[in-house]
């Protein structure tokens, strides 16, 4: 279950899906593909407790959630994209797209390397282990799933958002 509130989605502009839009239960802007997953990360501090999740834009259902673990928001965004790609491959899903609001994470996925500066400590060991696994997955698998930029300024917060921001923009 995913909780959506007026801060999560830009509710000033859209309250419900338009009557013509029968491809989603979410109030998505017309230009957003509903046959998609949205990923996002949340982190309290930098570094700090980090978690990430994925939401199906057709149903609003949470596809996965991981964390919290000690890390950074950028690491969480990267791991969320790779987790979604791996799960799509595992389930044979080839017709969806992935939305992410993180330019850094999308670039890291494209380059198959997470360029984090997170210090290696016992507290951050799990995050570094997951990053290594994700990088290995990217190097050993090919994927054709489009990873699209979620336009937060235009569309409001991504539906996978954790809703913790107080007026900040990515």
Model-derived segments and their meaning:
Residues 43-46, 86-163:
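RNase H catalytic domain
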Residues 61-65, 78-79, 90, 121-125:
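Glycine-rich loops and low-complexity Gly/Arg-rich segments
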Residues 168-170:
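Acidic, His- and aromatic-enriched active-site or binding-groove loops in soluble protein domains
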Residues 12-75, 87:
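RNase H-like nuclease fold core
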Residues 76-84:
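An active-site-proximal "capping" alpha-helix that borders the catalytic cofactor pocket
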């Amino acid at each position: 279950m995913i909780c959506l509130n007026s801060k999560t989605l830009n509710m000033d502009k859209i309250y419900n899906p338009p009557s013509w839009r029968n491809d989603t239960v979410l109030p998505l802007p017309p230009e957003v593909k509903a046959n998609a997953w949205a990923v996002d990360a949340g982190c309290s501090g930098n570094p700090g407790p980090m978690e990430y999740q994925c939401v199906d834009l057709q149903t609003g259902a949470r596809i996965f959630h991981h964390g919290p673990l000690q890390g950074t928001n950028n690491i969480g965004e990267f791991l969320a994209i790779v987790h979604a790609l791996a799960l799509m491959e595992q389930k044979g899903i080839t017709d969806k797209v992935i939305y992410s609001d993180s330019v850094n994470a999308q670039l890291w996925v494209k380059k198959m390397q997470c360029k984090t500066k997170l210090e290696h400590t016992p507290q951050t060991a799990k995050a570094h282990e997951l990053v290594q696994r994700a990088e290995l997955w990217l190097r050993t698998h090919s994927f054709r799933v489009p990873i699209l930029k979620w336009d937060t300024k235009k569309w409001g917060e991504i539906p996978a958002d954790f809703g913790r921001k107080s007026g900040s923009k990515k």
